[in-house]
Amino acid sequence: MGQKVNPVGLRLGINRTWDSRWFADGNQYGKLLHQDLAVRAALKKRLYQAGVSRIIIERPHKKCRVTIYAARPGVIIGKKGADIDKLRKDLSIMTEGEVHLNIVEIRKPETDAQLVAESIAQQLERRIAFRRAMKRSIQSAVRLGAKGIRINVSGRLGGAEIARMEWYREGRVPLHTLRADIDFGFAEAKTTYGIIGVKTWIFKGEVLEHDPMALDKRLATESGPAGEGGGRERGDRPDRGDRRDRRDRA
């Protein structure tokens, strides 16, 4: 059987680059690596409601710059910036140094693979039928400009005794084409029957030139700086689309 390699790792240095961007001596490398892992785990847990997609960590000259890509930046910033100030202080304690925080809003969370996977996982935890959740996410992504999307769910689907895997695909998802801009996301739904894994691949187009920073440039054009109000709630557009579909069928 053919196995699916992680498309992000396969394209590192071609049209993707690392999310941790720093160099260190041999005796400092392990310490900084564990700091990065701790910072990412803490942020994902603490900012779960903000819809965090990516966390980029840079370390220029004994400082730490953390860039958070989120669908709802208002949750991170808080009222008059109170929450982000507290978050900055907590991260400074973890990294033992000065921390600069940048918050970037994701304007189209329906086409972000990580946010789509987390959205489906949350719906499965609320006992929404997995096929309905998958089809709704696929329709939203295609409507907002994705050239292809594939979603896998695996586990005890619907409470079945035997675990299995089901997947849906719409459009093109060329996993073997290295110049293809493939966004990949993974999430886990913790249900009463056990854990259900959700994987999402979204094809955004092709990057013809050799540019490891291609993803960052695309996100810069799609996203905007975070404001006090935060982003749109995920799930709003799919619900409106479902209502229109039901009206058309009636």
Swiss-Prot record:
Residues 230-250 have a biased composition (Basic and acidic residues). Residues 215-250 are annotated as: Disordered. It holds the Pfam family KH_2. GO terms for molecular function: mRNA binding; rRNA binding; structural constituent of ribosome. One of its GO terms (biological process) is translation. Residues 39-107 form the KH type-2 domain. GO terms for cellular component: cytosolic small ribosomal subunit. Keywords: Ribonucleoprotein, Ribosomal protein, RNA-binding, rRNA-binding. The keyword Ribonucleoprotein applies. NCBIfam families: rpsC_bact. Belongs to the universal ribosomal protein uS3 family. Part of the 30S ribosomal subunit. Forms a tight complex with proteins S10 and S14. Binds the lower part of the 30S subunit head. Binds mRNA in the 70S ribosome, positioning it for translation. This is Small ribosomal subunit protein uS3. It comes from Caulobacter vibrioides (strain NA1000 / CB15N) (Caulobacter crescentus). The lineage of its organism: Bacteria, Pseudomonadati, Pseudomonadota, Alphaproteobacteria, Caulobacterales. The gene is rpsC.
